[in-house]
């Protein structure tokens, strides 16, 4: 049975939720599931915007047929070829061999690589600035390279001001029938998942996102239809402002993310003392995590959110504790920058981790200010925090 939502007089959401998938891209936990959004326009010609993941293909196809009500499907626009949005292309074309597929040249190359065969006579290749008229609706095509794949584009309905934004403005989380942003408490229930989605999936490509936002600023956008998460039909400035923060790597809030690596609880105890001292000084926006038991996607999200980081780690085989090193490597890979960082190191002998973390941050990441006064403990903290000044490239032993 179809499960659809009418967005406007002639535009329908025909996507589906997936609550069974545990890991998005087989790496990021999604305890609230995820939606795969697809949209169907009923004009003089019928137009389907993107498809859906194979896991929800049956529901997706039922939705499409339920809205078409026997009409043929004239066009399929593919904005993004990643399989969670393109895996059902062949199933659509098997049921609707009359359909012409509209996308860009690189997208058709990727479709062929993935095995989504579209015959040449059934292709319309578009580029930046091209338009296609389907009746009263005219769609313009805008390139969005590296947001977050090279072939990505967005489609803009010049008639209604609807932006089909591909993976931009998306979020983790199943919709559960509530399609629009004003049908949910976005700040409370969706913002963290939207941030975690952006920072871990798109975060590396901030400059490309800013290019797309620059193009979008020239459009009179009335509604945003992303491929994941809620549809934005009001307060669009809110999500655009969030994207500007994330894409420019500016923190959303003044606060401290305190991440610790502790084998026997001693480094954790030191981190707890620091958190208490910060609270006494009036900094109560503190968020403390064990790097060994917290999925990195949550740490990355909060690293983008807050202005200050504290990294507290034991020395491990004369190096950085592996889970902490993974976190550092992820921050580097996702291009995090413009943060103030404090360091706590622990070692019972040959305590090298503080200097190694400092060296990593200063040599591999942009605009990271590492405080020169670090904290060294030997095995466990006694008598208060010990400060080591002017370290470079390693901490002094005390």
Predicted regions and their residues:
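FMN-binding flavodoxin-like domain, especially the glycine-rich phosphate-binding loop
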Residues: 175, 186-224, 229-231, 273-289, ...
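Active-site-proximal loop/helix segment associated with metal-binding centers of metalloenzymes
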Residues: 148-152, 160, 168-203, 247-252
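Metallo-beta-lactamase
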Residues: 5-9, 102-152, 205-211
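Conserved beta-strand hairpin/beta-sheet module of binuclear metal-dependent hydrolase folds
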Residues: 4-65, 154-157, 162-165, 267
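Short N-terminal or domain-adjacent regulatory/targeting segments
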Residues: 225-252, 326
